[in-house]
């Protein structure tokens, strides 16, 4: 995008990189992002004729953005073009020209870097007075065919200079980027590669990593200075973030909460987010219904669960963590230097904490959750041994904090106002781990370190402390079968003994020993769940950091020994139970899956089941990676309770009273009745019925219980209510006929897919 008249405080990238003071300011300034132009400058850019703007802003035919001589080698990630790698796979660049393509062999450079897609955000004929003349055939400074003939995909999204696109258009562009990144690296350009390009990349980061808008803007600007220029563009990224929030909501009764929706409304939201094959497959079926039914059949047939390996490679998450950590480190260094130079007049610790709170306000004022780099498990800073290090900290952060801890200068009982950057009304009651404290701690250093490092430790949900994060919600990596999961285990305590797919629950053993009730508060969502808990106890993955709920007031060494001992015990119990469950026959597994669908759980651990379902509800609401991790859940009762709880939390029942009245009035034939409903209703119900059919022969009483429970969930009508018998008899006849017909179709042939 054209930069127009030089933005206020704009400096060339080479100057920013070579000037250490500017680097410190760029990385250390964590204040809310501001526009690069004044209000007057923005207004002028919209009213000055294009040829005059080009002449005044970037030099007309001698356009600086299209002249490689104006940029250092560091500013040319692709030689010959003003360009920067924003991530390892996304290149922001100024527009190339046919002359530059030939002179600098840019297409060959693209291929050598693995760039498979170029996205052009310009309109044909734009900036005709800048740089090299436009190609008459395309209206751009190059011919798109030059890239396409080399096997590089070309996309053009016309976007007005200095302007913004509609939110749905940006979402479509982001989904195209998501698809393109599966093929290889992506290059994006407008005119200068700053404004529109920066907005699109920031929106992609928000979409892919659930960063807040301001975090994404700061990250993009750290990689490509002066990006995202106008007030409208800043607002666009922020509004896009808000636009995505309700679309991502699966369970309206769980954090982050949203208004309840009907089935048709949910399917519309789902279509906004899905793309490609998945969008076509799930056009009329909620993803959670389809996935649970598929997982049930996999469990019943003891098929290996295919899921992505989240532990392979750091990917985008680590790159973002590193960049943001560097920015916080620079801020910490700056404040420590300021403190050392003013020893004679130490500032008030509360003022220091407030200063950091203000600087870091952008990381909590838009959303209260960010699963990418924050330490959800511990709100306080635990002893930083080699077992406790996180990618969220740079080595300098860790060393500095550990030195302070070893000197006894950082007690573990700092008030919540210092620990987190949330405002008081946003803060949640949390549990703390305690270690021996020095008699006279340096409160200023304590506040300084804690306030800076708390950038990483802001929790989004009080009840998510026990969930295993496994890094980023971005899942790069190969598809691998989870051997530990395919062992036929249906119990919660063996659900993925060695799998990253299981949400890990905190142990409450030490909570009951704590006389202080303030250390026992755990947040729960209020979604309705079904059935009773599966047998077994909650296990903790040995690679998962412990929740603060696990910690007593023990010294560091004792804490680590207990940590390792408990992990070994959990693994041993899980292994023995897994061997027992693997002995179930195929018929027994199918019956167990059918009982789960019918909500016939004979276990007595109802609260345990409810708690695990609530954890999955929060997980699905808070991060996209939960769809991958839930494939590791091996308890059919948890899966079915999760599915039915979603059905029952809809604003209106799947089958409304009007639908039932219509079926009764028309005396519809059972074979045709479902087709009288809307397609979303029909396909959703059929998906569940297909699942029970594919479980093959099941006991009559289990099937009857399934039909009764399905009718109750789909209609929200109890059998003993006023119209209950009519509703049940009408739908039971239709459902039974559908099951019989489907069984006839599959009796002598292969089982149809869901």
UniProtKB/Swiss-Prot annotation:
Keywords: Cilium biogenesis/degradation, Hydrolase, Phosphoprotein, Protein phosphatase. The active site is at residue 190. The keyword Hydrolase applies. Its EC number is 3.1.3.-. Residues 82-253 form the Tyrosine-protein phosphatase domain. CDD domains: PTP_PTPDC1. It comes from the Eukaryota. GO terms for cellular component: cytoplasm; cytosol; nucleoplasm. Residues 487-554 are annotated as: Disordered. Residues 487-498 have a biased composition (Polar residues). It is an enzyme of class 3 (hydrolase). GO terms for biological process: cilium assembly. One of its GO terms (molecular function) is protein tyrosine phosphatase activity. InterPro entries: Dual-sp_phosphatase_cat-dom, Prot-tyrosine_phosphatase-like, PTP, PTPDC1_PTP, Tyr_Pase_AS, Tyr_Pase_cat, Tyr_Pase_dom, TYR_PHOSPHATASE_DUAL_dom. The modification Phosphoserine is found at residues 392, 394, 547. May play roles in cilia formation and/or maintenance. Belongs to the protein-tyrosine phosphatase family. Non-receptor class PTPDC1 subfamily. PANTHER family: TYROSINE SPECIFIC PROTEIN PHOSPHATASE AND DUAL SPECIFICITY PROTEIN PHOSPHATASE. This is Protein tyrosine phosphatase domain-containing protein 1.
């Amino acid at each position: 995008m054209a930069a127009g008249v030089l933005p206020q405080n704009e400096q060339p990238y080479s100057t920013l990189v070579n000037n250490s003071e500017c680097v410190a300011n760029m990385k250390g300034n964590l204040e809310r992002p501001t526009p690069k132009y004044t209000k007057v400058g923005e207004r002028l850019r919209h009213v000055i004729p294009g040829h005059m703007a080009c002449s005044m802003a970037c030099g007309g035919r001698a356009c600086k953005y299209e002249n490689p001589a104006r940029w250092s080698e560091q500013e040319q990630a692709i030689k010959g073009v003003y360009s920067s790698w924003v991530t390892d796979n996304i290149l922001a660049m100024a527009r190339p020209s046919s002359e530059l393509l030939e002179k600098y062999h840019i297409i060959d450079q693209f291929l050598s870097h693995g760039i498979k897609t170029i996205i052009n955000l310009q309109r044909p004929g734009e900036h005709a007075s800048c740089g090299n003349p436009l190609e008459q055939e395309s209206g751009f400074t190059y011919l798109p065919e030059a890239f396409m003939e080399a096997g590089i995909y070309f996309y053009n999204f016309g976007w007005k200079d200095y302007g913004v696109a509609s939110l749905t258009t940006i979402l479509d562009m982001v989904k195209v980027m998501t698809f393109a990144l599966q093929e290889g690296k992506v290059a994006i350009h407008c005119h200068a590669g700053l404004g529109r390009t920066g907005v699109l990349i920031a929106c992609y980061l928000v979409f892919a990593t659930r960063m807040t808008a301001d975090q994404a803007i700061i990250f993009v600007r750290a990689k490509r200075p002066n990006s995202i220029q106008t007030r409208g563009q800043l607002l666009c990224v922020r509004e896009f973030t808000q636009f995505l929030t309700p679309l991502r909501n699966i369970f309206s009764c769980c954090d982050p909460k949203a208004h309840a929706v009907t089935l048709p409304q949910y399917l519309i939201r789902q279509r906004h987010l899905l793309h490609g094959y998945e969008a076509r497959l799930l056009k009329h079926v909620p993803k959670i219904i389809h996935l649970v039914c598929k997982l049930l059949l996999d469990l019943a047939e003891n098929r290996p669960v295919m899921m992505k390996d989240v532990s392979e490679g750091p990917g985008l998450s680590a790159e973002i963590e590193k960049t943001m950590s560097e920015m916080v480190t620079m801020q910490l260094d700056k404040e420590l230097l300021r403190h050392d130079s003013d020893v004679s007049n130490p500032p008030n610790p509360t003022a220091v904490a407030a200063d950091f709170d203000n600087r870091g306000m952008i990381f909590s004022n838009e959303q209260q959750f960010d699963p990418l780099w924050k330490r959800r498990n511990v709100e306080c800073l635990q002893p930083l041994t080699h077992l406790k290090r996180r990618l969220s900290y740079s080595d300098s952060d860790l060393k500095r904090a550990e030195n302070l801890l070893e000197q006894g200068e950082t007690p573990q009982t700092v008030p919540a106002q210092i620990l987190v950057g949330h405002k008081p009304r946003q803060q949640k009651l949390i549990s703390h781990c305690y270690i021996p404290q020095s008699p006279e701690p340096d409160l200023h250093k304590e506040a300084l370190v804690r306030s800076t490092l708390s950038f990483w430790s802001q929790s989004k949900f009080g009840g998510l402390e026990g969930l295993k994060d496994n890094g980023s919600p971005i899942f790069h990596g190969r598809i691998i079968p989870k051997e530990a999961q395919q062992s036929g285990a249906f119990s919660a305590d063996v659900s993925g003994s060695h799998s990253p797919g299981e949400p890990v629950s905190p142990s409450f053993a030490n909570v009951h020993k704590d006389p202080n009730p303030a250390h026992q508060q755990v947040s729960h969502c209020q979604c309705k769940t079904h059935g009773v808990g599966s047998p077994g106890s909650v296990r903790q993955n040995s690679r998962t950091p412990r929740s603060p709920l696990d910690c007593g007031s023990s010294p560091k060494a004792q804490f680590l020994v207990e940590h390792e001992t408990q992990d070994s015990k959990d693994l041993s119990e899980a292994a023995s139970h897994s061997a027992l469950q693997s002995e179930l026959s195929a018929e027994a597994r199918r019956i167990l899956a059918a009982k789960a669908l019918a909500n016939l759980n004979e276990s007595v651990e109802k609260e345990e089941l409810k708690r695990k379902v609530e954890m999955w509800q929060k997980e699905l609401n808070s991060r996209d990676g939960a769809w991958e991790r839930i494939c590791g859940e091996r308890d059919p009762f948890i899966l079915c309770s999760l599915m039915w709880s979603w059905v029952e939390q809809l604003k209106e029942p799947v089958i409304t009273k009007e639908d039932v009245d219509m079926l009764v009035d028309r005396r519809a034939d059972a074979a045709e009745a479902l087709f009288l409903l809307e397609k979303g209703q029909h396909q959703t119900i059929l998906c569940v019925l297909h699942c029970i059919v594919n479980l093959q022969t099941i006991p009559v009483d289990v099937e009857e219980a399934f039909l009764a429970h399905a009718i109750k969930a789909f209609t929200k009508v109890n059998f003993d209510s006023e119209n209950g018998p009519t509703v049940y008899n009408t739908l039971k006849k239709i459902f039974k006929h559908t099951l019989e017909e489907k069984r006839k179709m599959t009796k002598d042939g292969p089982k149809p897919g869901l």
